[in-house]
Amino acid sequence: MFPPSGSTGLIPPSHFQARPLSTLPRMAPTWLSDIPLVQPPGHQDVSERRLDTQRPQVTMWERDVSSDRQEPGRRGRSWGLEGSQALSQQAEVIVRQLQELRRLEEEVRLLRETSLQQKMRLEAQAMELEALARAEKAGRAEAEGLRAALAGAEVVRKNLEEGSQRELEEVQRLHQEQLSSLTQAHEEALSSLTSKAEGLEKSLSSLETRRAGEAKELAEAQREAELLRKQLSKTQEDLEAQVTLVENLRKYVGEQVPSEVHSQTWELERQKLLETMQHLQEDRDSLHATAELLQVRVQSLTHILALQEEELTRKVQPSDSLEPEFTRKCQSLLNRWREKVFALMVQLKAQELEHSDSVKQLKGQVASLQEKVTSQSQEQAILQRSLQDKAAEVEVERMGAKGLQLELSRAQEARRRWQQQTASAEEQLRLVVNAVSSSQIWLETTMAKVEGAAAQLPSLNNRLSYAVRKVHTIRGLIARKLALAQLRQESCPLPPPVTDVSLELQQLREERNRLDAELQLSARLIQQEVGRAREQGEAERQQLSKVAQQLEQELQQTQESLASLGLQLEVARQGQQESTEEAASLRQELTQQQELYGQALQEKVAEVETRLREQLSDTERRLNEARREHAKAVVSLRQIQRRAAQEKERSQELRRLQEEARKEEGQRLARRLQELERDKNLMLATLQQEGLLSRYKQQRLLTVLPSLLDKKKSVVSSPRPPECSASAPVAAAVPTRESIKGSLSVLLDDLQDLSEAISKEEAVCQGDNLDRCSSSNPQMSS
């Protein structure tokens, strides 16, 4: 691209000629033609650099030309000397220029290839944009289909909610009825139980009053028992005094009687006395008890008799207290009264026993009633729980309907979410792989460090053993030196001065101590270093083992997560594949249905067009006949020309109105078809559930169509109005127009009925299979 640095510039051809310079303008060098006039924008900087490098060559060439013009004679004289050198330089310059041209051609070829590649890339991008546009259109169509399906599902959900609401209302009504009946029965049972409880409370209050009286009697009996205890204690004291007296007497008698006889008699007497004392105590206790009971009964009887006698004396006032008969009567009356009181007391005791039995029975009844109440409360709780369960079931069904709605709303986002999950799973997989590789590298480095530390341990042990051996050798040398010194001292006849020997010995000892200290210090330091190294190595080994275990656990967890992610990825791919297959099947069904609907619509439109054309030709024929009759009437009856013109205008206005009505009806039919198409998309889901009614709708459609066709034929084949005589042509023209108007209105009604029948047939065809739909189409066309 750049000219060679060795050349100072191109030599013009006139330099090698011996003839004088011509007057023609000198040509520019050939390399100037190599510079392109229009360069591509990508290589503009290269061309600018090339021009910058070639400018000095141009200036040098101009300088040479000017020098040639000024000194032609001198250049001619130097021809012989510089000829061969100039030729060689020119050949080199030509070779370099050829190389430069080849390089430039190669660059041009590369630029063309790059431009072609850019064009191909742009075309590929354009194709990708078109594909994206098509995919976007397909996605919009699919979204519309899904919206239609969602609308159908919404209708189904509303139906389900209405059904569940009705069932819930029915269950609530039944529950309310059961609850009302149970509450009524419970209230009745409670009222009966309250009445019984009131009676029992009354009986209990009476029993409590009696118990209070009995408690008072018991207190009196306790007081009497206290008095009896006091008397018993007094009698015991007297008995003890008598016993002491008897013992004293025995002692006195025992002194008089021998010991053996005394002991035997004393034992026998003591046993007898003990037995008699026990019997007496038992008799005394029984007598005390009977006496207490009799005393209580006597006191009660005396008290009752005193009260009753007071009553009698109060009620009966004797007229003469000295009469004996009255006293006898009173005495006999008192005796009878006492007998009756005794009988009443016996009866009262029997009533008390019966009352205690009745109280026990009532307590048993109360316990049974309480058990019944608890059982009824348990049944009520069970019924409430069952009601709560039913309400929970209804709520669960409602939540299930909501869940279905949410699933329908989430179905649109499933594919995108699966794609995102797959992308995130792949990215996580890459991150996990990188983490595992980095952790493995770090583990390898740490293991290498541990191995290096373990490899250093033998060298440290060797150094330690070497130091120990060195210490032993130094000690041996010192001992040898000391022994030699002692031998010298012994062998020498004249010992040296004591001061020198003592100094030398002291120095040797100091040196020995210093060497021992140094050796001990070095050995201790070496041992410390070895222990530290061992502890550090052990700690590093433990840490590395922990790290290795953690890394193994993390590796296992990552493997498990990778396995789970792989499973999730596989499930997501399967779901995506299923969704794509389902979308493809739905698209295929949609295209088939669209084709079927298009064919059926085209057939119906063609049929309607043929019928309309036939009816239009019929109307035109009738209009032509009416015009001919009108012309005949105009020719024959000049006097009614004005009326004929008016009738003509009326007929034209009627035709215009008919055309406008037909246009409006066509527009209305088109709008109706669009509305039916929109309603058809919305009612696909509901019509699929009505598959059982398809046969009835088809039969109904087949029965309606022949009646419509017969009606049309009867309208079309209606008898033409007879030609009137020349005396009444207007009366003949008016019925024809009325018949035309009636036929058009009938035609419009038939068209409306036919459009409704077409929409019903399309709904039926959507619910049935393709064979039934294809078999019903010829019947519709017939």
Curated annotation (Swiss-Prot):
Changing R103W: In allele HCR*WWCC; risk factor for psoriasis. GO terms for cellular component: centriole; cytosol; nucleus. Its main location: cytoplasm. Keywords: Coiled coil, Cytoplasm, Developmental protein, Differentiation, Nucleus. InterPro entries: HCR (IPR009800). Residues 111-303, 344-437, 498-691 form a coiled coil. Residues 62-82, 177-218 are annotated as: Disordered. Residues 62-74, 208-218 have a biased composition (Basic and acidic residues). The keyword Cytoplasm applies. Signal peptide: none annotated. Changing R109W: In allele HCR*WWCC; risk factor for psoriasis. Found in all tissues tested, abundantly expressed in heart, liver, skeletal muscle, kidney and pancreas, and to a lesser extent in lung and placenta. Overexpressed in keratinocytes of psoriatic lesions. It is found in: Cytoplasm; Nucleus. It comes from the Eukaryota. One of its GO terms (molecular function) is identical protein binding. GO terms for biological process: cell differentiation; protein export from nucleus. Pfam families: HCR. May be a regulator of keratinocyte proliferation or differentiation. This is Coiled-coil alpha-helical rod protein 1. It comes from Homo sapiens (Human). The lineage of its organism: Eukaryota, Metazoa, Chordata, Craniata, Vertebrata.
